[in-house]
Every structure is written in C-alpha cells, then in structure tokens.
C-alpha cells in the first residue's frame, strides 16, 4: 500500500521568536495522507489539465496550490475539487494544534505520564492549561533546549510559584490551580522527582548544526499512521510504503526516529499524489484557521454571522464527505466540540442554541476520548505491528 503525505500551515519546529511562539497565525498543523488509487490520480491529472491555467492566471505551472483554489475567482474549481477528491475512504486527515502539542507534552512529562494513570485529571488539567500564555511555554521550550539539573530545579520552582492567573476565569478553575500546586508538592515529596524530569525531558536531535526538537510533523505522521492501522485491521508495517513531500530539516528529523521504516521523500513538482495531498491539506488548514482558536465565548458570534456562511458550508463539505474515522482532531476537547457542532447540519437559530450544542458535545467528548485512549504500551504495540 502506497500512501502519500503532505502538510499545511507553517511546518517545522515549534520554537521561540522574541518572546512569542513562532507559529503566529498558523497554529493548526494539517497533515493529509492519500492512499494511492490509480483512477483517482488519473482524475486529478485531468483536473489539473482543465484548471491549471485558469487557477494560475493564464500561466502553465507545475502545480495547482490549494491556497489558490480558495480564492473567490477559483470557486468553481474548488467546488469540483471537493466533490471529486475529498470523499471516500482513502484520504486521512490529522489536524494538530501546535499549542496542544506543547501543553500535552509538558503535562505528561511533568506529571509523570498522567494521561495513563488518571485520565480524568489529565484532561481537566489539559483543558485548564490550554490557556497558559506564551511566556509559560517559552520557559518550557527553553528548558528542553538547555536541559540540566540546575535548570530543571529552577523550572520546578517556577511551576510551584506560578499562580496560573491567565487560566483562571471561574471559581472551579481557581480550584484546579490549587490542585496543580498540591500535586507538584506531592510529587516532590516522593523523592527523585527532579532526576526523573531531567532523564525524561524531550530530547534534542543534532541536525544541520542545530539542536532540534518539538517538531510536530513527526508526531502527526505517527498519529495518522496509527489511525490508518486502527481502521484497517491487520495492516502491518511491511505492507505500508510512505512517500512524503521533501522538507529540509523535517525529513532528517523523521529519518532519525524512523530508521527502519519504508519512507521516501519526493519532490511534489514531480509527484501528482503529493500534489493532491497538498491541495487537500491546504483547504483544511485554511478553513480550520478561520474557525479556531476558541479563546473565549466572544469568539462564537462571528461563526454564525453572514460573513461566515460560505466558510461553514464549505467546512461542512470537507468534514462530512469523507469517513469521520479518517479524521483525527488533536486539539482541546472544547475546540473539538465546537468543530463537531459547526460541521453539523443543524440550523442554529441563536447564539444560545449554538453554545448549548457545543456544551452538550463537550460533555460527551470526554467519554469519546476515554474510549479511544491508548496507553503508551498499546500505542507501541499497534505502531510496531
């Protein structure tokens, strides 16, 4: 089985730019895998022949870019693309919030694999900590880049003193802040806490004369392949051949961890299948960035406005035309509930009705996540199959 991958939204390493995280307005990384189907690839070639010059303003280009399909002028081409290619069971989509990536990584590291031994507490803390500011996360990233016992001790002290004021907007959240502080104190009393953190922090990989880590591409690729293996029973690694668009540094990072995996990095200009994956990734990335992030309830009204009617209709199509088991949302449960409500066919008559639907979905989302949760050992077993 050949599967072709490409991505969208500012790929690469999550790092620091000044006093901010470097993803700016491209927080949601999208990876798309296309399982090769000769007839679909042939259809895409015909689509390119038909629309290439029109989309590219009269020029014959090597590729049609997904971002160009989203312009008003190219709406007819976009409609044909969605109805022809974003459907069926051979497309896999992973949407990964880069902030979620950092917060969940921090949470599992600092609280010693919390997601495996207390799923309820893990998601309560995760939803709470998604509100932390960039300064908190830059402190964490700096530690991953400069790991030492002294720096770990300083970071633990910082966590103990941190009041998480930016996360507290209700009495319930004030209690969570206290619970985090108490848990840190309890872990310290068990002994060797600092040593554990020093030994288990995210490692750096030396690539092109720089230390690299926190590259979301690798994790998203692994999540997507796990999703595919979960859906296609008995699919083994020996049956999968991965083709991925060439990306400097990222491909070296992936190769470092996947030494024995069949993965070939190819030029998109020469590979129709990668171009198809690129177009789909660009469409998802552009649309999801219009809907998320959900920072406060004040972000909801715009989603129901007339200005967003085209966005809602289009995002409903791209999410509902393919098998939902082939789409993985690695975002907060709150935002996942919002997306599920937004792509539904419900005609919300008021903001209250929309918000109520989001809250109902949030309540059920926890049970969904719990039923889908795999421990580290279970994940490794599936990945190695």
Roles of regions detected by a PLM:
Residues 1-94:
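An N-terminal structural lobe/cap that precedes and organizes the functional/catalytic core
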Residues 89-385:
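Charge-dense, low-complexity intrinsically disordered regions
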């Amino acid at each position: 089985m050949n599967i072709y991958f490409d991505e969208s939204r500012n790929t690469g390493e999550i790092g620091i730019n000044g006093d901010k995280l470097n993803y700016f307005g491209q927080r949601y990384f999208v990876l798309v895998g296309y399982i090769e189907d000769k007839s679909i690839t042939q259809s895409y070639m015909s689509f390119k022949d038909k629309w290439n010059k029109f989309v590219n303003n009269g020029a014959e280009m090597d590729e049609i870019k997904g971002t160009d399909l989203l312009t008003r002028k190219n709406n007819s081409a976009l409609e044909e693309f969605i109805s022809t290619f974003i459907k069926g069971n051979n497309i896999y989509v992973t949407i990964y919030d880069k902030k979620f990536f950092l917060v969940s990584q921090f949470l599992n590291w600092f609280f010693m694999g919390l997601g495996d031994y207390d799923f309820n507490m893990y998601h309560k803390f995760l939803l709470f900590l998604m509100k932390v500011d960039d300064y908190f996360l830059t402190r964490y990233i700096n530690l991953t880049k400069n790991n030492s016992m002294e720096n770990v001790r300083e970071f633990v002290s910082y966590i103990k003193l941190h009041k998480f004021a930016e996360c507290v907007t209700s009495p319930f959240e004030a209690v969570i802040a206290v619970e985090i502080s108490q848990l840190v104190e309890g872990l310290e009393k068990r002994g060797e806490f600092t040593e554990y953190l020093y030994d288990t922090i995210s490692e750096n990989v030396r690539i092109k004369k720089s230390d690299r880590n926190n590259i979301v591409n690798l994790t998203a690729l692994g999540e997507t392949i796990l999703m595919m293996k979960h859906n296609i029973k008995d699919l083994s690694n020996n049956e999968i051949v991965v083709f991925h668009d060439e990306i400097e540094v990222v491909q070296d990072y992936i190769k470092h961890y996947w030494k024995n995996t069949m993965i070939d990095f190819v030029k998109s200009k020469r590979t129709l299948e990668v171009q198809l994956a690129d177009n789909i990734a660009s469409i998802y990335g552009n649309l999801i960035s219009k809907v998320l992030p959900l920072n406060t309830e004040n972000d909801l009204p715009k989603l129901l406005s007339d200005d967003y009617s085209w966005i809602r209709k289009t995002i409903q199509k791209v999410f509902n035309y393919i098998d939902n088991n082939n789409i993985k949302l690695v975002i907060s449960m709150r935002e996942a509930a919002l997306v599920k409500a937004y792509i539904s066919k419900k005609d919300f008559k008021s903001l209250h009705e929309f918000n109520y639907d989001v809250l109902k979905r949030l309540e059920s989302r926890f049970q969904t996540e719990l039923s889908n949760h795999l421990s580290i050992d279970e994940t490794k077993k599936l990945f190695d199959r």
